[in-house]
């Protein structure tokens, strides 16, 4: 069951994402070779989405997996052209779970601020 905070977060995310590009303009961007919307990434970082799963010690908000699922759901619904799932969710989760304190300090603060974009690999 979602808490009141989760519901507010979901509504905030949905509202922001509904203001972004339409499917037609996303298709045009993809066909032109654009792989990411830099202005959107900056906005996501400023709103704290890039630090959703990152501890406050490293500049994140540590809102937990339910909040991360709500973000993923909204991003999927909006077809957002962004590396936020691979960087802010998958990579930061792995580093937070398995990284040393030095690795966390180096990578997580940079991910939370939006300065570093990581990706995840699931095979070779």
Regions inferred by a protein language model and the residue ranges of each:
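Intrinsic disorder at enzyme termini
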Residues: 1-5
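Conserved alpha-helical interface elements of two-component signaling phosphotransfer modules
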Residues: 8
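Conserved "HGTGT" condensation-loop signature of ketosynthase/thiolase-family condensing enzymes
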Residues: 11
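Glycine-rich flavin
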Residues: 18, 22-124
């Amino acid at each position: 069951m979602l808490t009141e905070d989760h519901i507010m977060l979901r509504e905030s995310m949905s509202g922001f994402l509904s203001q972004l590009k339409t499917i037609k303009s996303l298709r045009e961007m993809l066909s032109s070779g654009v792989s990411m919307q830099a202005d959107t990434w900056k906005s996501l970082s400023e709103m704290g989405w890039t630090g959703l799963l990152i501890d406050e010690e490293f500049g994140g908000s540590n809102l937990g997996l339910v909040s991360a699922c709500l973000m993923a759901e909204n991003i999927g619904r909006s077809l957002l052209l962004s590396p936020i799932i691979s960087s802010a969710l998958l990579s930061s989760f792995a580093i937070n779970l398995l990284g040393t304190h030095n690795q966390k300090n180096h990578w997580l603060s940079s991910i939370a601020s939006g300065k570093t974009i990581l990706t995840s690999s699931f095979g070779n």
